[in-house]
Amino acid sequence: MKVQIKRLHPEAMIPERQTKLASGFDLHVLDAVLPENASDPYYDHFEAIRIFPGERILVRTGIAIQMGEGMEAQVRPRSGLALRHGITLLNSPGTVDADYTGDVGVILINLGDKHVDIRKKDRVAQLVFQPVFHQVELEERESLNETERGDGGFGHTGVNSQP
């Protein structure tokens, strides 16, 4: 399966798998901005941005992708950043639809208790490709069939098996 990729900036790094059987392609930082500056053009002299506890930033990768119908790309966190620094994705997974051809952005949030510097070329997320069922149609009904679970919501099936 082939996915087309385009550099939107000459310094953008093409995502790569780190091992042969890795599910995700690592996404690299081209630059990063605070949310209110998301529409700014790419910064030519970007080196790093400091993300403080509770703060969020938009990482721009400088790449765009084009997939075939029936696919989506998911932007997912990297476990090492989450474990060591409390850095994760605010909207995880982020969805890149098959018809979106703009910059593949990454919304990072610092859930840790210390600031973290996000530098140009850092690997901050991974891109995983998944099938999508576009032929699904929603059909409104007055009632739904009975199931064993019914409308039991969060925590309804229990937390652990201890008495």
From Swiss-Prot:
Catalyzed chemical reaction(s): dUTP + H2O = dUMP + diphosphate + H(+)
The annotated regions of Basic and acidic residues compositional bias extend over 140-151
Name of the gene: dut
Record has Ribosomal protein as a keyword? no
| Gene3D superfamilies from the UniProt entry | 2.70.40.10
Q: Can the keyword Metal-binding be found in this entry's annotation?
A: yes
Superkingdom of this entry's organism? Bacteria
Family note: Belongs to the dUTPase family.
Q: List GO molecular-function terms, semicolon-separated.
A: dUTP diphosphatase activity; magnesium ion binding
Name the record gives this protein: Deoxyuridine 5'-triphosphate nucleotidohydrolase
Which source organism? Heliobacterium modesticaldum (strain ATCC 51547 / Ice1)
Q: Which cofactor does it need?
A: Mg(2+)
Top-tier EC class: hydrolase
Write out the residues that bind substrate: 78-80, 91, 95-97
Q: What InterPro entries is this protein classified in? A: dUTPase, dUTPase-like, dUTPase-like_sf, dUTPase_trimeric
Instruction: Output the SUPFAM superfamilies linked to this UniProt entry.
Output: dUTPase-like (SSF51283)
